Amino acid sequence: MTQLETRTEPMVLNFGPHHPSMHGVLRLVVTLDGEDVVDCEPVIGYLHRGMEKIAENRTNVMFVPYVSRWDYAAGMFNEAITVNAPERLADVKVPRRASYIRVMMLELNRIANHLLWLGPFLADVGAQTPFFYIFREREMIYDLWEAATGQRMVNNNYFRIGGVAADLPYGWLEKLDDFCNWFGPKIDEYEKLITNNPIFRRRIEGLGTITREQAINWSLSGPMLRASGVAWDLRKVDHYECYDDFDWEVATAQEGCCFARYRVRLQEMRESLKILRQAAQQIPGGPTENLEAKRQLEGKDSEFYGFDYQIVAKKVAPTFKIPNGQLYTRVESGKGELGVFLMGNNDVTPWRWKIRAADFNNLQILPHLLKGVKVADIMAILGSIDVIMGSVDR
């Protein structure tokens, strides 16, 4: 009796760019030997819109509404880096009240970003219920953004060079406090529902492991880096905005696997709540209604008309010129280090505007992580990276 030859030639399979489990228009050209992944080549660029060239043909005031389309799950971070770069180059000071408002918007966006990661990630590994829960929480964040900026998800157009577009509306800080009190127990609910679920843990624990050295060598950032034991958070490292005024910890894990990245993001949401509560209590001038009452009571000589109680240093003219010089500035977005290299030549438009997107760099390690795993694990590992193709392709 002859023995049948079971080995076959490797098969090349395309995942995406229209596959429902792809996080945007990403295409993976995967080489398979049976169920085992031999090689993987990510193909990007399907959502390229020339954002850098658009920036180089717009004034800063004109470009801010565009930037929500880089990472459309975290538009506030895009706006922050877009105004931070000219501020630093032109040495524009930001009032403390405006800085506190910025921090509150950024931390709300961090929570919204992690929630939008959590739902689809769990859906990728087979847990459907949390996918619906996360939109319940995000809805409250949308309501806060809508009250302050007029827009709910993207295109808030709220940050300005030297501050923010408008002060917080009456009662906003009270609504923020209600959200913090309501959302804290919801994270505990996620922990009970997900973290110690034996099926979930067996599905992703030990999967897609990245060592500390690999994370550093691949220039990873954000939860991808901190889940491998590197306590690197730009809010602590660069001391930008007013983060030094608050008591909070950098969320880290040591294992470097998909489960560690999940735990880091959950802990980051808890730390963001800490920052939000402290910012709401410590904001210079307090709630807008109290600040305006103090100004009216004390008259024009009131200290509450001082620089630190303003929402913008000075209204930026449409003809604002970016000075000669160059710099690289960065913020800690929900996905990692979001940076901009800006080169000015004393003109209203930048000479060079280079975007350093966190998920673009983090996506580079995907082929390394996928070699040797099963086909079923591809989506779990990709989901743990947290990519938005608008940011990757720009």
UniProtKB/Swiss-Prot annotation:
Coiled coil: none annotated. InterPro entries: NADH_Q_OxRdtase_suD, NADH_UbQ_OxRdtase_49kDa_CS, NDH1_su_D/H, NiFe-Hase_large. One of its GO terms (molecular function) is NAD binding. It is found in: Cellular thylakoid membrane. One of its GO terms (cellular component) is plasma membrane-derived thylakoid membrane. Belongs to the complex I 49 kDa subunit family. This is NAD(P)H-quinone oxidoreductase subunit H. It comes from Synechococcus sp. (strain RCC307).
